């Protein structure tokens, strides 16, 4: 929690990765140490829910359990998930399964052609079908704000955020969003984000690109 004058703001980073993603290297202890300046953080490893529970229970981090999912038509993130969602289900089905868990559909790096973006046309289609809750317009792995996605989000009255997409510990919180208080649940987070501010900083240091294969953990999967 941060106070500027008489105003209290809550800093949140809704797109981060730990070593469980396979293409990131951050151990959980180091992750917890680097997340200290944040008031709420979403753990969104690729196809894995293990780290969020450990960071909450063993390190007392205020976390949202999430997952970045390869739909076969680009990536989406599910927030407030209780169960992992299979990959390659297609965009619409993946979004519906997130909603079935009372989770939030978060679209990361929507038009970034260097990554698994869904693209502006598919994003517009999902918005028209009321299958999107949050759109990421600032990502620390990009030098620019996604103005095209931001205009689309505003036209559908959807909240926009900036997030780090941290794959190394020092990137955690490099881009973030501020809200007025901590949310009690998923729907309240969306409401708070409609009156939020985002802060974007490009931050993409060189990292080891060697991919680590993560085996399932009986204790970590919900």
Give the residues covered by each predicted segment:
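Charged catalytic cores and adjacent phosphate/nucleic-acid-binding surfaces used
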Residues: 1-24, 28-32, 50-54, 58-65, ...
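Secondary-structure boundary/capping motif
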Residues: 38, 96-99
């Amino acid at each position: 929690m941060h106070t500027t004058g008489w105003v209290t703001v809550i800093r949140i980073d809704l797109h981060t990765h730990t070593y469980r993603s396979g293409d990131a290297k951050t151990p959980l202890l180091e992750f917890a140490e680097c997340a200290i300046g944040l008031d709420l953080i979403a753990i969104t490893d690729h196809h894995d829910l293990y780290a969020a529970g450990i960071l909450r229970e063993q390190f007392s981090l205020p976390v949202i359990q999430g997952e970045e999912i390869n739909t076969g038509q680009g990536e989406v993130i599910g927030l407030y998930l209780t169960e992992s969602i299979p990959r390659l289900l297609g965009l619409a089905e993946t979004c519906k399964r997130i909603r079935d868990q009372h989770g939030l559909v978060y679209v990361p790096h929507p038009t970034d052609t260097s990554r698994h973006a869904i693209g502006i046309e598919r994003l517009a289609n999902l918005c028209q079908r009321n299958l999107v809750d949050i759109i990421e317009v600032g990502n620390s792995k990009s030098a620019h704000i996604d103005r095209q996605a931001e205009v689309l989000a505003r036209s559908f009255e959807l909240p926009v955020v900036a997030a780090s997409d941290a794959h190394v510990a020092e990137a955690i919180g490099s881009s973030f969003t501020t809200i007025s208080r901590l949310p009690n649940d998923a729907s309240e987070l969306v409401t708070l984000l409609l009156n939020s501010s985002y802060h974007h900083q490009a931050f993409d240091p060189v990292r080891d690109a060697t991919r680590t294969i993560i085996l399932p953990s009986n204790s970590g999967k919900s």
